[in-house]
């Protein structure tokens, strides 16, 4: 089983939201949203040559995957803007469902993370936008 197959298998068989596999890497998370990617990014971790599997990938997560150096991603659901990010930066992508945009959890509008980065063309500005949005959501504003 290669890293990609292992990541997809682990995601589908476990209770995980995000799995990254590679040489000496077996990263799993049950956290929702972009936190499973933002935390290792902020800790300076990089996953060059690794494969990832994720339940839902919007543009914010796609930017984080690019910054983390992931080589290939499987997504249960992926947004068109996220797919475009992966294509632009040469990250392999497989998915079950392609959607226009990622909705928020209550299905009343756009996901706040997707909205936070929708106008960005480069991944470098994404972490700051994501952290600002998380702080705003946490404060209830």
Residue ranges and their predicted role:
Residues 77-81:
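Short, polar loop motifs at secondary-structure junctions
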């Amino acid at each position: 089983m290669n890293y990609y197959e292992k990541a997809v298998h682990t995601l589908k068989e476990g209770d995980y939201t995000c799995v990254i596999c590679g040489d000496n890497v077996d990263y799993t998370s049950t956290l929702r949203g972009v936190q499973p990617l933002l935390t290792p990014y902020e800790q300076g971790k990089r996953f060059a040559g690794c494969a990832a599997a994720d339940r839902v990938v919007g543009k914010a997560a796609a930017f984080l995957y690019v910054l983390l150096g992931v080589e290939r991603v499987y997504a249960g659901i992926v947004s068109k803007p996220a797919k475009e990010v992966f294509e632009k930066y040469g990250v392999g992508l497989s998915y079950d469902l392609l959607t226009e945009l990622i909705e928020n959890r209550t299905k009343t509008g756009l996901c706040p993370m997707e909205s936070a980065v929708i106008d960005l063309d480069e991944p470098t500005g994404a972490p700051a936008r994501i952290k600002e949005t998380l702080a705003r959501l946490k404060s209830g504003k």
